[in-house]
Amino acid sequence: MKNFNPIMGNNNMPEYISVISSSQCARIRIDDIEVIEQEGRKLHVITPDREYSFYESMKEIIPVLACRAFYRPIRGLIINFDHVKEITGNMVSFHSGQCVTMGKNSITRTRTAYKKYLLRYPPYSLGEGGEYAPMIAAERSRPELS
């Protein structure tokens, strides 16, 4: 039996998932999800406000998250780049204060994917001599429009 059900929005993409378990029934806005962790057969869906736990497999929930900023660095973890504040060392920090620690290889792949995600949203800076430094310098030297 499915313990969650996607609720479709106007653009034919799911906006919410309904979570049904023996102890709770809830409707979670997909864009509010920060982290999804798998612990055995149980999924923990973490939002800035609370954590929801229910029995379901990752493969059932992944299609619902398609075409959004979700990234799966390891088999039992999905993070939402829209909620990431920063990635430092081996830790991903979220705007809500939640943190996720990863191993060296996983954090390297996650950092690379997060950089690609961030490059979709200018302005950005890679510092002196970075790949985009000439483009940024040209923007700064352009006279202001009146």
Name the predicted role of every residue range.
Residues 2-146:
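Basic, polyanion-interacting recognition surfaces, primarily
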